[in-house]
């Protein structure tokens, strides 16, 4: 449909929310163009891990987040570091990596479970859909500040602004 020109379409080719001089943006363009990634040694905003098998990749990702990056750059792994993967399912997808990273970085505390996902006080979360009523949008990142297991609700802090999520909203 898009190629036919019958329906109006817009191609988004500008990357927002990121320093345009970094390797993250450069490599995002390479991925979109089907080109090889640019990888540099030393201090950079982009690290690529090549692993022998998926299980090793998970272990290395956890090690990078919990030890290597905080030690080398003095960063808080919960607040300052982002793991990007291209899929949700399987051992290397966001679903599993989020569980493993939560075990390593935020293993204790009050929690609620929705649809198999555990939300724990202190977790970093990302809004997946625009919610105009709450004034939060796809890609916004916040931290779980409080949970109420009786009401199946939680409060997420987005840049100092608390937003309440009820049971049905937790899928957002």
Where are these regions (language model features)?
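Conserved helicase motor core of P-loop NTPases
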Residues: 1-125, 131-133
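Conserved nucleotide-binding/hydrolysis modules and their immediate coupling elements
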Residues: 99-172
């Amino acid at each position: 449909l898009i190629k036919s020109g019958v329906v109006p379409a817009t191609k988004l080719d500008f990357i927002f929310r990121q320093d345009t001089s970094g390797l993250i943006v450069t490599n995002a363009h390479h991925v979109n163009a089907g080109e090889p990634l640019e990888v540099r040694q030393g201090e950079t905003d982009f690290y690529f891990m090549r692993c022998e098998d998926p299980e090793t990749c998970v272990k290395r990702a956890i090690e990078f987040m919990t030890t290597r990056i905080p030690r080398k750059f003095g960063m808080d792994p919960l607040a300052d570091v982002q793991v990007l993967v291209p899929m949700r399912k399987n051992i290397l997808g966001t679903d599993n990596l989020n569980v493993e990273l939560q075990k390593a970085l935020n293993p204790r505390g009050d929690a609620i479970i929705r649809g198999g996902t555990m939300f724990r006080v202190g977790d970093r979360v990302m809004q997946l859909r625009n919610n105009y009523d709450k004034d939060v949008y796809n890609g916004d990142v916040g931290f779980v500040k409080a949970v109420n297991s009786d009401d199946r609700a939680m409060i997420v802090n987005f840049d100092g602004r608390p937003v309440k999520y009820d049971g049905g909203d937790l899928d957002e």
